[in-house]
Regions:
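Short intrinsically disordered terminal tails
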Residues: 1-5, 61-70
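Short, charge-rich amphipathic interface segments used for partner binding and complex assembly
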Residues: 33-65
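N-terminal acidic leader/helix
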Residues: 1-30
Length: 70
């Protein structure tokens, strides 16, 4: 079982990443990009946040597995 501090950190980070990703996606959907360059940049930011979230979830899974193996 992941200790409470680690679990709280992971949950807080995931919530922040998800909130940012949703906000940027809303900006994209609402036509905030006026140039293709802005569109590409915003897509890159969203992609980076998605990668960060995936890595965070993978890390949480790894920690859980390691603790279960002990």
């Amino acid at each position: 079982v992941i200790d409470l501090l680690t679990a709280d950190f992971i949950a807080a980070m995931r919530d922040k990443l998800r909130t940012d990703m949703n906000n940027y996606t809303d900006d994209l959907a609402n036509g905030q990009c006026t140039t293709f360059e802005q569109y590409k940049e915003l897509c890159g930011v969203i992609r980076g946040l998605a990668f960060a979230e995936r890595h965070l979830l993978d890390l949480a899974e790894y920690i859980q597995k390691e603790e279960n193996d002990e």
